[in-house]
Amino acid sequence: MTITAKPDSGYQLDDLTVTDKNGKELKLTDKGNGKYTFTMPASKVEINATFVKEVETSPFSDVSTSAYYYEAVKWAQEKGITGGIGNGLFGPNQPCTRAQIVTFLWRAAGSPVVNYAMNMSDVPEGSYYAEAVRWALSEGVATGTTGNTFSPDSECTRAQAVAFLFRYAASEAVTLQELVSGFSDADSVPGYALPAMNWALAEEIVQGNGSKLMPNDSCTRAQIVTFLFRAYQDK
């Protein structure tokens, strides 16, 4: 006799027993894919299955399942947006560089190949971020720090990261609410980033830290992946 014990999504089989009319447990053979077989006795049998919730496991050893950014990191890893920094680590508290941010965005966009003459002396052809920078420059998502440099290893501020996201979304500043003024450090938001920050607040991509936006603080890898998750998880 074959029985199938298939749990609902998010659950796993914890225990499965088959007993005869006398309460004797019958031997089950696991055939894989949730199927089990047993020898049917000359009597009725009772089948009992217990299911429990699956234990959530993190894709990276330094990302706790209870961290505010866990779902974002998990989403980004599943989407191929990030593979971490190696050795099973994500580096959530490390500052995110300009190269990393445009690479995350490029991958979120589907890693498009563009025909664009890139003249950035500090972006080596063949580097992991070269095609991402080429795309970002061609789409106006990012600009160089000078006419022929991109500064790929420079740390990105929260304001700069939000500006990249805003440009990629191609939002119109004229449609935005003025929300930045509700934060105590509103005056420290760079002028170029004001439309982007208002957009990010309106879309709940950025929520601030209490009464502060901290626009000039370094944007961590956990933060940029969280911004991306909030902006593009349903796209």
Where are these regions (language model features)?
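Feature responds to low-complexity, polar/acidic, surface-exposed segments characteristic
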Residues: 26-30, 52-70, 83-131, 139-159, ...
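Extracellular/surface recognition and adhesion modules
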Residues: 3-5, 16, 36-38, 49, ...
